[in-house]
Regions:
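Extracytoplasmic small-molecule ligand-binding "clamshell" domains
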Residues: 38, 45-46, 52-78, 103
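Glycine-/proline-rich flexible loop or hinge segments
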Residues: 23-25, 50-55, 93, 100-104
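Immediate post-signal peptide segment of exported/extracytoplasmic ligand-binding proteins
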Residues: 15-24, 37, 41-52, 124, ...
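Contiguous mixed-secondary-structure segments that line small-molecule binding/active-site clefts
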Residues: 40-41, 72, 77, 82-170
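Extracytoplasmic "Venus flytrap"
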Residues: 21-38, 58-63
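Bacterial N-terminal signal peptides
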Residues: 2-12
């Protein structure tokens, strides 16, 4: 549904400028890559000589799980994760669940009214600071039996799911 942008609480500071290492798993041309590249372009323009955001895409710094560990260690400063967040804390599972968000207008409302408080609480629990939410498309469940439009439509359907306990529970 949406992807959470995570930042470590501390940045690596060199003698003259701040270096921000920003990792993600997206391949060139993906929404992950386009989003992070655009962020880096805007940030670098504003930072000028004060620092630089360097992007490491295509899992150059590891998969999501390793990226999140590197945030904790301080060897990477920002990470754009995917479904791995639900394994860090249950509340992040909201991003894995289909049928919760009806459309973009609904998501905008949730983003403004619900997520800020949720993320503030999660920072204290997890040590990760969520600084933005970016779209990564809406979740759809597909199969070769019938359309899935409501959770009830899943009855009797066997599916393979990514490693997300909330998707498995559904």
């Amino acid at each position: 549904l949406f992807v959470v942008l995570i930042s470590a609480l501390f940045l690596t500071i060199s003698a003259n400028a701040v270096e921000v290492k920003f990792g993600h798993v997206g391949k060139p041309g993906s929404l992950f890559s386009a989003s992070v590249d655009h962020f880096a372009k805007l940030a670098n323009k504003r930072l000028g000589s004060k620092g630089k955001v360097t992007v490491f895409g295509s899992s150059q710094l590891g998969k999501d799980k390793q990226g999140m560990q590197k945030l904790k260690l301080g060897t990477v400063n920002m990470w754009l994760p995917s479904s791995v967040m639900a394994s860090i804390h249950d509340e992040f599972g909201v991003f894995d669940m289909p049928f919760i968000i009806k459309n973009r207008k609904h998501m905008n409302k949730v983003e403004k009214q619900v997520l800020p408080g949720m993320f503030k609480n999660l920072e204290a629990k997890t040590g990760y600071k969520v600084i933005a939410v970016w779209e990564n498309g809406f979740r759809h469940i597909t199969n070769n039996k019938r359309a899935i439009n409501t959770p009830g439509d899943l009855k009797g359907i066997k599916l393979r799911t990514p490693k997300s306990k909330w998707r498995v529970k559904m």
